[in-house]
C-alpha cells in the first residue's frame, strides 16, 4: 500500500481505465476499440486460456487490428506506392491542392 494513495483518495481507478476499455470511463466516452474488446472478452470469458486462443481468435485479431492498425497502414502504403507509380508513368496527375500549388485558404 503506497504512503499516499491519491487514486483512492480522489475516487479514481486509472489502472482499470488503462487495462480494460470496457470499464467505466472517466467522461463516459467509450474507447475506440471498445466494441472489439467487449466481443473478445465475452467470447473468452469462462472457457479458459487454451480454448479461448482457438475459439476466439477472430475476435482477438479484430481487437488487435483496431488497436495497432497494421493492416490499415499496410493498405495505405500499398495505395501510396501505386499512386506514386502512376504519377511516375504519367498516367495520373494529382490535384493542385495535393501538391501544395492550390489557392491559399484563410
UniProtKB/Swiss-Prot annotation:
Keywords: Disulfide bond, Electron transport, Membrane, Mitochondrion, Mitochondrion inner membrane, Respiratory chain, Transport. It is a peripheral membrane protein. A motif (Cx9C motif 2) lies at residues 56-66. Signal peptide: none annotated. PROSITE patterns: CHCH. It is found in: Mitochondrion inner membrane; Mitochondrion intermembrane space. GO terms for cellular component: mitochondrial inner membrane; mitochondrial intermembrane space; mitochondrion; respiratory chain complex I. GO terms for biological process: mitochondrial respiratory chain complex I assembly. Residues 84-106 are annotated as: Disordered. Mammalian complex I is composed of 45 different subunits. This is a component of the iron-sulfur (IP) fragment of the enzyme. Accessory subunit of the mitochondrial membrane respiratory chain NADH dehydrogenase (Complex I), that is believed not to be involved in catalysis. Complex I functions in the transfer of electrons from NADH to the respiratory chain. The immediate electron acceptor for the enzyme is believed to be ubiquinone. Belongs to the complex I NDUFS5 subunit family. This is NADH dehydrogenase [ubiquinone] iron-sulfur protein 5. It comes from Gorilla gorilla gorilla. The gene is NDUFS5.
